């Protein structure tokens, strides 16, 4: 048997090139004294800034944080170490002292040759390693070249920087002179000559500045409204004001103009005292304007912004804080804002989570509460109370001991702040629900004493008795508003709504409902009937809400556009051209009716408000009329005008509405069934069980629980096939292609009462074939 040859022993000193390279790199790192792992005391910790409003920190004060490190746990002793994450410089996580201790050789780093080297003694210690003579000469020449290049480059940079700075100073000086002497600019004179503004001599009695008068002239506001004429002088004198005026009377500029006047006065004082302009981050707002809805906040910003854009020398910045938009962007806008406009929820969210923002807001000169009855009503807008409390709160230790009484008065946030309150309704009795069997009062809705007491309890006014300015003590509604009521059956509201819309072609119409589901259904119903309908409710995304308002208010849009909305559109929206307001559901409270109807007949224009009233809503409508028109001289039980629709028209359009309702209900039922099915399927997947829709429907139908009949009806409506839906749509399309015949022979048009010439020209109401009497209020 042959003996196996013995293998040579492996030389352990031989390693692969790759391993040698890694070991050399590790050795180099260890030689440098830096392995990237440090203790907690050597890190550059940063203190955590706590928000201004923190209810309970639980003892966590003085917290510190650091970013860009990984935790390295020790092998045996449990000690925790840290190291920089990949891609982050290791020096950035260390303290300066720790950095010097870890890298002492950085202090003696070679920085090139200098003239001091010649004077140094021969035996002096030097960290420069001696090189051969040839390499010294090369390095010397190279360093001289680099030094010359660097000097030339630095000289060029300095020259460019100086020229840029000089140019910037010249530009800022020119801009400053132009802003101060804006009225003397020839370009401004040329612009005013080209654009002839309105005559603003009627504003002279209010004592406004030339800049504001110029802006009002460009905006074509020739004379102030009654509420502006009454409120602006009182606000300019420094009084707290409670303004009560009908909707569409110009309340926005009644408080917007005094705020801008204060801004201009402050700007003049800064220029006369030759103060340096503060940076945006150091500036403090002069006014906070609170609004109950996002749409109203956007509108306030738009109206005040228009006056700022038209008034020369007024560069006030507006920060708009509303929900549905980026919080980070709004925080940046707030840092340099002069006027803050927002809804209570978002304003309080930003103030409570920020650092130093509440202290900034305590220095405002104006607090404006628009639509105050809604913002200050019980059970709504808890954030308003938080905002008001934070503005009036004086923290302990702010006024040091030994200060006199004057300094304590100056430290009171409300001592220098004017409070301005505006709305069309203040009486609390208007906020009671109209429906139900509870006892209701026939009180005067314009009771001044109750309104004053109610507001004095909620708000901290600077004066004991603020100025109460009531511009409509007799009638709560606008003068040019016509009110009417249409009585119908409980299941005929869709039919009468469509008929009312046919009676008012080329009218911009706003339809109010009491629920979001009704908005969705009515929008689809009217779109199925080929009417330009848009939706607006609180569940929509903010961008979609703004898009609906923009499309509805755009002058280039269809004049027959219809906006179906909940009460989010009831307050403050100033949309030009709204001719008709329809209450699909009777309003729950009287103040809601006042604000809904106030969307039309604004600024002296005429408008109509119609309630579609079912049998179950009649009691509430009677109470509504009694509250709103309590001071009417005629003493009628129901002062609303009863409107009678032509029964021929109602019967002719009924097939259209029936077909459209079937199509709409089928589509909604299909969407709802699909959504529920998807939810159940996802829930079954999460639970890890098998989902069978048919088995689930069988088990669901066996019970006798609540909603069983509704689910069964929904399933039946949603079971309509696509072919059946297509047939219904084709039938509806044929009906919509024809005019509604109101008793005219289509074969012998000339024999009837039809105006053929007007028919060919497309004049009159093109929805009907034949004469139809308009609705008389």
UniProtKB/Swiss-Prot annotation:
Compartment(s) of residence: Nucleus, Nucleolus
Reaction(s) catalysed by this chain's protein: ATP + H2O = ADP + phosphate + H(+)
Biological processes per GO annotation: rRNA processing
Motif (Q motif): 201-229
InterPro entries (UniProt xref): DEAD/DEAH_box_helicase_dom (IPR011545), Helicase_ATP-bd (IPR014001), Helicase_C-like (IPR001650), P-loop_NTPase (IPR027417), RNA-helicase_DEAD-box_CS (IPR000629), RNA_helicase_DEAD_Q_motif (IPR014014)
EC category: hydrolase
Helicase C-terminal domain boundaries: 496-646
Sequence motif: DEAD box, positions: 370-373
Region (Disordered): 1-38, 92-176, 392-417, 692-720
Biased segments, Basic residues type: 703-713
E.C. numbers: 3.6.4.13
Signal peptide: none
Record GO cellular component, one term: nucleolus
Keyword line: ATP-binding, Helicase, Hydrolase, Nucleotide-binding, Nucleus, Ribosome biogenesis, RNA-binding, rRNA processing
Stretches with biased composition (Acidic residues): 101-119, 395-413
Keyword Nucleus attributed: yes
Gene3D superfamilies: P-loop containing nucleotide triphosphate hydrolases
Xref: PANTHER family: RNA HELICASE (PTHR24031)
Function: ATP-binding RNA helicase involved in the biogenesis of 60S ribosomal subunits and is required for the normal formation of 25S and 5.8S rRNAs.
Family note: Belongs to the DEAD box helicase family. DDX24/MAK5 subfamily.
Protein's name according to its UniProt entry: ATP-dependent RNA helicase mak5
Naturally occurring in which organism (per UniProt): Aspergillus fumigatus (strain ATCC MYA-4609 / CBS 101355 / FGSC A1100 / Af293)
Lineage: Eukaryota, Fungi, Dikarya, Ascomycota, Pezizomycotina
């Amino acid at each position: 048997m042959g003996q196996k040859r013995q293998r040579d022993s492996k030389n352990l000193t031989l390693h692969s090139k790759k391993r040698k390279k890694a070991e050399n790199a590790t050795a180099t790192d260890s030689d440098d004294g830096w392995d990237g792992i440090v203790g907690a005391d050597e890190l550059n910790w940063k203190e955590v800034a706590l928000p201004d409003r923190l209810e309970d920190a639980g003892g966590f004060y003085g917290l510190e944080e650091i970013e860009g490190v990984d935790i390295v746990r020790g092998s045996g002793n449990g000690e925790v170490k840290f190291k920089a994450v990949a891609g982050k410089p290791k020096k950035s996580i260390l303290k300066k002292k720790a950095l010097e201790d870890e890298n002492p050789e950085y202090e003696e780093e070679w920085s090139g040759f200098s003239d001091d080297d010649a004077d140094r003694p021969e035996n002096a210690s030097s960290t420069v390693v001696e090189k051969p003579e040839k390499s010294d000469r090369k390095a010397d020449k190279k360093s001289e070249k680099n030094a010359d290049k660097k000097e030339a480059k630095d000289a060029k940079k300095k020259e460019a920087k100086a020229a840029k700075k000089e140019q910037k100073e010249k530009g800022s000086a020119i801009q400053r002179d132009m802003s101060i002497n804006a009225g003397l600019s020839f370009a401004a004179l040329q612009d005013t000559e080209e654009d002839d503004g309105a005559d603003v001599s009627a504003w002279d009695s209010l004592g406004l500045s030339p800049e504001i008068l110029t802006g009002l002239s460009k905006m074509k506001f020739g004379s102030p409204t009654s509420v502006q004429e009454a409120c602006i002088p009182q606000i300019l004198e420094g009084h707290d004001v409670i303004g009560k005026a009908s909707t569409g009377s110009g309340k926005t500029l009644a408080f917007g103009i005094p705020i801008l006047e204060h801004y201009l006065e402050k700007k003049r004082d800064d220029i006369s005292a030759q103060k340096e302009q503060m940076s945006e981050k150091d500036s403090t707002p002069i006014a906070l304007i609170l609004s109950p809805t996002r749409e109203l906040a956007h509108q306030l910003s738009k109206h005040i912004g228009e006056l700022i854009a038209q008034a020369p020398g007024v560069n006030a910045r507006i920060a708009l804080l509303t929900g549905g938009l980026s919080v980070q962007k709004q925080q940046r806008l707030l840092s340099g804002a002069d006027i803050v406009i927002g809804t209570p929820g978002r304003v309080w969210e930003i103030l409570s989570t920020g650092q130093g923002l509440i202290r900034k807001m305590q220095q405002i000169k104006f607090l404006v509460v628009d639509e105050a009855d809604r913002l200050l009503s019980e059970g709504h807008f808890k954030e308003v109370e938080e905002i008001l409390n934070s503005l009036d709160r004086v923290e302990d230790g702010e006024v040091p001991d030994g200060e006199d009484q004057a300094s304590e008065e100056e430290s009171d946030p409300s001592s220098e702040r004017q409070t301005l309150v505006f709305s069309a309704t203040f009486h609390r009795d208007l906020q009671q629900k109209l429906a139900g069997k509870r006892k209701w009062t026939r009180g005067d809705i314009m009771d001044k004493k109750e309104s004053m007491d109610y507001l004095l309890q909620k708000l901290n006014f600077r004066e004991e008795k603020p100025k109460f300015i009531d511009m409509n003590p007799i009638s709560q509604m606008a003068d040019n508003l016509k009110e009417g009521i249409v009585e119908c059956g409980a299941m005929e509201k869709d039919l009468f709504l469509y008929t009312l819309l046919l009676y008012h072609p080329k009218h911009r119409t706003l339809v109010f409902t009491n629920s979001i589901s009704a908005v969705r259904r009515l929008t689809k119903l009217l779109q199925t009937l080929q009417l330009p309908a848009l939706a607006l409710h609180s569940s929509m995304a903010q961008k979609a809400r703004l898009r609906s308002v923009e499309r509805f208010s755009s002058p280039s849009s269809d004049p027959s556009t219809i906006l179906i909305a909940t009460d989010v559109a009831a307050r403050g929206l100033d949309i030009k051209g709204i001719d008709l307001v329809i209450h699909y559901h009777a309003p729950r409270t009287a103040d809601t009716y006042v604000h809904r109807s106030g969307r039309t007949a604004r600024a002296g224009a005429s408008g109509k408000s119609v309630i579609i009233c079912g049998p179950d809503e009649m009691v509430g409508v009677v109470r509504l009329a009694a509250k709103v028109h309590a001071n009417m001289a005629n003493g009628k039980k129901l002062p609303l005008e009863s409107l009678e629709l032509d029964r021929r028209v109602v019967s002719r359009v009924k097939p259209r509405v029936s077909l459209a309702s079937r199509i709409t209900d089928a589509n909604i039922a299909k969407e709802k069934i699909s959504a529920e099915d998807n939810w159940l399927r996802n829930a079954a997947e999460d639970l890890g069980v098998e989902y069978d829709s048919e088995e689930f429907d069988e088990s669901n139908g066996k019970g006798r629980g609540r909603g069983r009949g509704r689910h069964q009806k929904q399933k039946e409506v949603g079971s309509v096939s696509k072919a059946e839906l297509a047939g219904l749509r084709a039938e509806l399309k044929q009906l919509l292609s024809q005019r509604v015949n109101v008793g005219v022979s289509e074969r012998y048009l000339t024999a009837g009462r039809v105006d053929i010439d007007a028919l060919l020209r497309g004049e009159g109401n093109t929805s009907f074939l034949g004469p139809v009497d308009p609705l008389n209020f």
